[in-house]
Design a protein with these regions (language model features):
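Hydrophobic/aromatic-rich alpha-helical bundle segments in the mid-to-C-terminal region
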Residues: 84-85, 106-157
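Helix-turn-helix
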Residues: 1-2, 9, 13-36
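Amphipathic alpha-helical packing segments from all-alpha helical-bundle domains
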Residues: 62-73, 82-108, 118, 141-145
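Hydrophobic core segments within long, regular secondary-structure runs in both alpha-
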Residues: 35, 54, 58, 96, ...
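Hydrophobic alpha-helical connector segments
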Residues: 32-67, 116-124
């Protein structure tokens, strides 16, 4: 006769507790002074009419203003630190987006250049950032040019 096969006993598995999850400490770096200034500027630009917003932006990047020095210092420090670099770029992008919104909601017509609001915002922000490198005597002329580029120059020059 063939050997009868023995039935294997069914054993219950012991319930094991999952290993306790290790708490990961996340440290959020404090925002730099440049980030704080850029975000405050973005907030100020949000509700202002375009010509006023451009004047605020140009004033913020004037050669004697604090913002250009702070941004440059933060940029130098963040060159080897990805998180700091991204945070600074994000803060600058908030200024550009705020300016873009202001341009899009502006009651006046499109600028003579025919740019979309996002491209015009980028161009105007770059122009205002460049004002920091101009001699103080040329700032008023540069602001006038920025206003003309936007299509929001005062009537009669």
């Amino acid at each position: 006769m063939a050997r009868a096969r023995r039935r294997q006993r069914k054993t219950r598995r012991k319930k094991t507790r999952p290993a306790p999850k290790r708490r990961i400490r996340v440290t959020v770096p404090r925002p730099t002074r440049a980030e704080t200034l850029l975000l405050a500027l973005a907030k100020d630009l949000a509700g202002a009419p375009l010509d006023g917003a451009l004047r605020k932006l140009a004033d913020a990047f004037a050669p004697s203003a604090e913002l250009p020095r702070e941004v440059y210092g933060a940029w130098i420090k963040s060159r080897r630190e990805k998180t700091a670099s991204l945070a600074l770029s994000w803060a600058r992008e908030q200024v550009r987006l705020s300016l873009e919104e202001t341009i899009a909601h502006s009651p006046r017509g499109r600028p003579a250049v025919g740019l979309t609001p996002d491209m015009l915002a980028w161009l105007l922000l770059a122009a205002c950032e460049a004002i920091a490198h101009e001699p103080p005597s040329a700032v008023a002329d540069r602001v006038r040019i920025v206003l003309e580029l936007s299509g929001h120059a005062a009537q009669g020059g």
